[in-house]
Amino acid sequence: MTDSQGRDHVQNCKMALKSDGTITGLYVEIHADMGAYLSSIAPLIPTVICITLFSGLYKNPGIWGETTGTLTNTVPVDAYRGAGRPEASFLVERLVDIAAQELDMDPIEIRRKNF
C-alpha cells in the first residue's frame, strides 16, 4: 500500500541547434499521469518545476513547454526524490548526446560551447 508514487511522464521533445552546436531552442511536450486525484503539489511537477528546469546547465535562448495532465486509476502523484529534476536532467542531457551524434561533434564540445 502506498499513498503516492513518482512521476509517470511521456515527454516528446525537439532541440534546435546551429551547425556549430550552439543551442537555439528547446520544445518539450509532457503527457503526465497524475493518478486518481491531485495532491496539493502534483500539478506543479510537470508544469512549473519540470519545465523551468529544462535548460539544465546550458544557455538556451528559447524554451517552450506544453503539459497535459491526465487523471487515471493509479495512485496519486506527489513530490519526492527530485520532483521534476531527474526528468528534466535526463531529457536535456540525452538531447545534447543525440545532437552531438547528428552533428558529428564531441558531446563534451557541445556542452562546453553552451555552458
Predicted segment positions?
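Beta-strand segments within the central parallel beta-sheet cores of soluble alpha/beta enzyme folds
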Residues: 1, 24-29, 107-115
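Short glycine-biased active-site loop of nucleotidyltransferases that positions the nucleotide triphosphate
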Residues: 3-7
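Short secondary-structure boundary/hinge segments and terminal tails
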Residues: 1-2, 34
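Glycine-rich loop/linker segments at domain edges
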Residues: 8-95
